[in-house]
């Protein structure tokens, strides 16, 4: 038996630097990107980043990305996208999926590998299209086709296919963005949250207006020039409405609860959106060796999930409330309070969802009974919230939102010359992904 040989000691943790980001303009579904696939868009986003940082023919540690809505052909989406860029073919790539938290989760996963010294550089991101959605055959027809495929003889195959009825051919299974266990859409769930937290329609519309105004101002001052690659003729997000007013928003009818008590409209909810985004993360040594300045550092992160299915009303949580739990856990790890941030980037799936989360953090009973805190987290300075607009204005291609927010916040901190920013993203399935950037 050979003598035991100890392994080398684990290296010290390294800081995870965000060097830049790139996305294509986001487009409302069935508009500018109606014929673009997930691979088309993700490739364009990654290639734009490769071009900007002159990464042609370089082998990176890895590329991680994902999509929520995928065709079966996209089983290796990120790797196929990498092979379509000018990165070295030796760059490993893989898919991640955590609903709307996908883009941020890919950055956390690759960032952890950089911190541990397993890799030196990575690209993280996401993509989604609701235009090129995977339309499946009727479920009954699908089972018949599978049965026919299992048959060994021609007679057996014909016998199975004889069960096909004409109506099955004209009744495809269309994708629906709803919770499998409740049958409710995310918007319907958010309506329940808005009623529980007594979020007024006027407050939702005001948040939507601010999102459009802030995004329009960011475009006017050229903030996104080094964060975006034009695609299919688009130079900016086509959901942006610079001329929107409170009066226009107030004129819209509720879309998820059409009764007099409904408050969520097409104006204060994100539309189905197509798009892709990514960020470049690396160790400080890798960046320094190439003369690339660091925008910010990814320092803390947390994920959480809530029970939105409990039969007990007192125990059942709102579908999109998981970030309310994840943020205080992250704050405890970092030794910070909710007020210790210069920027708050809270993903605007719905205006009501943002306002529910903020109200929960201010509520003593909720913070005590649900979050296990001795005091409420308190309020934030709303002037620091989504200062360059967010999903209500630019749209929300599910898996692409996280990298969009990361790149935006990193650049904001670099422009400011330092500071700290909080990212909060709710996700389907009652999940939440949050992170902290510092400079």
Model-derived features: positions:
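Conserved catalytic cysteine-centered active-site region
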Residues: 67-122, 165-169, 181-185, 243-271, ...
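Active-site-proximal alpha-helical scaffold in enzymes
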Residues: 98-128, 136, 194-223, 278-285, ...
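Conserved beta-ketoacyl condensing-enzyme motif
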Residues: 34-152, 222, 228-238, 339-361
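Active-site pocket-lining segment
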Residues: 306-393
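Flexible glycine-/small-residue-enriched beta->alpha junction loops
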Residues: 121-192
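Condensing-enzyme catalytic core mediating Claisen C-C bond formation in acyl metabolism
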Residues: 3-36, 160-176, 250-321, 325-333, ...
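Short, well-ordered amphipathic alpha-helical segments that serve as non-catalytic structural scaffolds
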Residues: 38-53, 77-81, 106, 186-193, ...
């Amino acid at each position: 038996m050979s003598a035991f040989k100890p392994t080398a000691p684990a290296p010290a943790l390294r800081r995870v630097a965000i060097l830049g980001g790139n996305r294509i303009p986001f487009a409302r579904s069935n508009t500018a990107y109606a014929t673009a696939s997930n691979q088309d868009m993700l490739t364009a986003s990654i290639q734009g980043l490769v071009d900007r940082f002159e990464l042609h023919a370089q082998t990176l540690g890895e590329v991680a990305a994902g999509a929520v809505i995928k065709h079966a052909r996209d089983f290796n989406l990120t790797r196929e996208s990498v092979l379509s860029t000018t990165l070295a073919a030796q760059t490993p790539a893989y898919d991640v999926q955590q609903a709307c938290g996908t883009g941020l989760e890919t950055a956390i996963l690759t960032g952890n590998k950089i911190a541990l010294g397993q890799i030196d550089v990575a690209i993280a991101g996401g993509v989604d299209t609701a235009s090129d959605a995977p339309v499946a055959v009727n479920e009954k027809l699908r089972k018949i086709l599978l049965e026919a495929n299992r048959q060994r003889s021609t007679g057996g195959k014909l016998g199975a296919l004889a069960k096909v009825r004409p109506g099955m051919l004209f009744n495809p299974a269309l994708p629906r963005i709803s919770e499998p266990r409740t049958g409710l859409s995310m918007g319907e769930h958010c309506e329940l949250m808005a009623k529980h937290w007594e979020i007024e329609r006027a407050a939702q519309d005001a948040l939507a207006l601010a999102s459009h105004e802030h995004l329009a101002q960011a475009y006017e001052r050229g903030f996104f020039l080094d964060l975006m690659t034009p695609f299919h003729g688009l130079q900016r997000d086509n959901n942006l409405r610079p001329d929107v007013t409170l009066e226009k928003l107030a004129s819209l009818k509720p879309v998820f609860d059409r009764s007099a008590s409904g408050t969520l409209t097409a104006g204060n909810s994100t539309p189905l959106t197509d798009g892709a985004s990514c960020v470049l993360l690396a160790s400080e040594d890798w960046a320094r060796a190439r003369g690339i300045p660091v925008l910010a550092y990814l320092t803390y992160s947390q994920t959480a999930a809530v029970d939105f299915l409990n039969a007990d009303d007192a125990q059942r949580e709102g579908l999109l409330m998981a970030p309310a739990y994840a943020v205080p856990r992250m704050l405890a790890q970092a030794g910070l309070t909710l007020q210790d941030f210069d920027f708050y980037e809270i993903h605007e799936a719905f205006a009501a969802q943002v306002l529910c989360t903020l109200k929960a953090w201010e509520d003593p009973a909720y913070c005590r009974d649900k979050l296990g805190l001795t005091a409420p987290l308190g309020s934030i300075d709303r002037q620091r919230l989504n200062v360059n607009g967010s999903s209500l204005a630019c749209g929300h291609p599910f898996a692409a939102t996280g990298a969009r927010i990361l790149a935006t916040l990193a650049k904001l901190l670099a422009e400011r010359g330092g500071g700290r920013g909080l990212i909060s993203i709710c996700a389907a399935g009652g999940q939440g992904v949050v992170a902290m950037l510092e400079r």
